Amino acid sequence: GVDDPKQRPLVRFRLGDLWGDAYIRDKGEHKGQAAASLKARLLKAEPLDRAELASIKLHELITRGIGYLSRPKDVSPKDGDPFLSCCVAALAGPVGEPEYRYFDTIVATPEAEHLVRRCVQAIEGDRKVLIAFR
């Protein structure tokens, strides 16, 4: 990437101290409306060698936010233990013009399973169930 202009450089970023930055839009269709962005302090940026990329065995995505809960489903695989799954439509982007990022999830803890099961009737009744997740 750095020496070959035809390849994109690979860069590893380490972020810390996340915070929300609220502001009022000063132009565009939503001028005068409140909005916010998520910012972070850049702790480190370093080139990532392609050989190191090939040695990565586990990709880790750590995220938190709010979103709508949908499609709760009990799954009983033939060769494994049954589990509860659901979809989270995570909100992303400006508050006035949100976009959605969809995550199909396995509900991992008994506490979370209890909470999701409490919402099943509302979801089946076409009510929106907004959740916070991390």
Question: What is the meaning of each model-derived region?
Answer:
Residues 1-134:
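Single-stranded nucleic acid-binding surfaces, predominantly the OB-fold ssDNA-binding core
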